[in-house]
């Protein structure tokens, strides 16, 4: 039996961007055994991580997921085109013009040029080289973080080319943790285009991508006429951070949505706060519907029952509207599925809580003024970093402590460790100890200790 293949195109030169990069192409198992067959195409950003590991040892492993889903008959065979980014040009190429004109990243935004590169250079080359179905209804564009943002922008600007858009954890807003200022990085489109859209976000991404911003864009899509559960799928991923492993864990869902069958709903899990305030931050429920295919999504058009509607009301989108103090049970009910959640309404909940964090580092740590542990930590003493910070109530962080990209913590032997995680539902005091660093030889600690 034939197997899928990965083709490397290197270098691929762009006359528009005046640079070169590697493009990887996944060809399905039947490609070389049936020369009459043509295939839908998925174009993906950050292509070097689509099939291969990043500096953290993580990958989307899209080829493995596509192989599995097609072998199970759950989706059509497709071609996947993974377009690598150029390291020092990634942010510039993935950013279209900012609506407020601010140049947040001190670089010239080249999103429009990158868009031209994809539409007029990459896609024509792929269509000429491989047996593709060229029409928009067979062509998808997908990315995560800044790659999700550029996919969103290109999709709305080029709907005659791309009929399906996957925006995973799209980087719509840069948040200044010190001031909590929101700096929007993109226009938000208010007109409806002939697109199928998948949009998601994890609940443990800290300040990197916050659900309230992604949800704001999702609400705008629904106001424009996109139907949740129809031409728009939204997913608020519980326990999910901002890394390749998180996107790998759920990429099957947009693949099924674009190229397969999502199946039948079999279970719903109702997530939400235990307490909300008559005065305080707005809150919403997150009913995650699971399907027999493995597909999942957040239902933004649900039916709810409340034991006492005089205490709280719930909109179809899951918004909680507190009326007075008290305790209620909220019940989700749709498509034969039910789930319940107990909720208390209190007079007031502050929007911010205090997190005090300290990190002790080993002797072998190279000199650095700051660490990153979900929050940027300054040095406050010898081998000690930390401080007290104000963060939004309920925010979650998933992280490894690091000194920068490719310089994260490991165990004492240099092996990878699990991600750390915390949720700031109330004030917290946290203390961590780093054993070693991935970029420091494992025996450095002993040598430096011996040298005093």
Q: Across the structure, where does each feature detected by a protein language model lie?
A:
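Insoluble glucan recognition modules
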Residues: 272, 278-280, 317, 321-327, ...
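Short, mixed charged/polar active-site loops
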Residues: 18-22, 295-296, 336-340
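Intrinsic N-terminal pre-sequences and regulatory tails
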Residues: 216-223, 234-236, 290-292, 316-317, ...
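Non-catalytic cap/lid and distal C-terminal segments of serine-dependent acyl enzymes
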Residues: 1-269, 283-286, 350-369, 381-386, ...
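Short flexible loop/turn segments that cap and initiate beta-strands
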Residues: 35-39, 290-316
């Amino acid at each position: 039996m034939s197997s899928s293949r990965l083709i490397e195109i290197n270098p691929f030169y762009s006359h528009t961007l005046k640079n070169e990069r590697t493009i990887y192409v996944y060809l399905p198992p039947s490609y070389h055994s049936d020369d009459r067959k043509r295939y839908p195409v998925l174009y993906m950003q950050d292509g070097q991580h689509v099939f291969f590991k990043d500096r953290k040892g993580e990958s989307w492993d899209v080829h493995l997921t596509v192989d599995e889903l097609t072998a199970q008959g759950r989706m059509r065979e497709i071609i996947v085109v993974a377009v690598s980014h150029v390291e020092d040009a990634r942010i510039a190429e993935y950013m279209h013009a900012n609506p407020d004109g601010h140049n947040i990243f001190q670089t010239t935004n080249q999103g429009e040029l990158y868009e031209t590169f994809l539409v007029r250079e990459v896609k024509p080359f792929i269509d000429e080289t491989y047996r593709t179905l060229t029409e928009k209804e067979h062509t998808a564009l997908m990315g995560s973080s800044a790659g999700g943002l550029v996919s969103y922008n290109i999709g709305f600007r080029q709907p005659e080319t791309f009929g399906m858009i996957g925006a995973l954890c799209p980087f719509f807003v840069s948040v200044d943790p010190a001031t909590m200022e929101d700096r929007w990085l993109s226009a938000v489109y208010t007109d409806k285009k002939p697109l199928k859209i998948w949009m998601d976000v994890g609940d443990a991404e800290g300040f990197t991508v916050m659900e309230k911003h992604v949800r704001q864009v999702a609400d705008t899509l629904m106001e424009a006429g996109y139907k949740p559960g129809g031409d728009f799928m939204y997913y608020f991923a519980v326990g999910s951070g901002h890394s390749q492993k998180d996107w790998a864990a759920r990429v099957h869902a947009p693949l099924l949505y674009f190229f397969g069958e999502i199946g039948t709903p079999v279970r719903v899990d109702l997530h939400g706060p235990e307490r909300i305030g008559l005065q305080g931050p707005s809150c919403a429920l997150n009913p995650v519907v699971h399907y027999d295919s493995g597909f999942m999504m957040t239902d933004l058009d649900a039916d709810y029952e409340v034991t006492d509607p005089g205490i709280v009301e719930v909109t179809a989108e899951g918004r909680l509207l507190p009326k007075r103090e008290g305790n209620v049970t909220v019940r989700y009910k749709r498509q034969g599925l039910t789930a319940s959640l107990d909720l208390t309404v209190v007079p007031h909940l502050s929007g911010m809580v205090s997190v005090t964090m300290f990190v002790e580092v080993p002797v072998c740590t190279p000199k650095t003024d700051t660490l990153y542990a979900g929050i940027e930590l300054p040095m406050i003493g010898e081998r000690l970093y930390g401080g007290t910070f104000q963060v939004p109530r309920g925010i979650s962080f998933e992280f490894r402590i690091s000194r920068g990209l490719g310089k994260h913590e490991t165990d004492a032997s240099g092996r990878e460790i699990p991600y750390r995680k915390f949720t700031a539902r109330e004030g917290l005091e946290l203390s961590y100890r780093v054993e070693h660093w991935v970029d420091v030889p494992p025996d450095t600690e002993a040598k430096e200790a011996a040298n005093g």
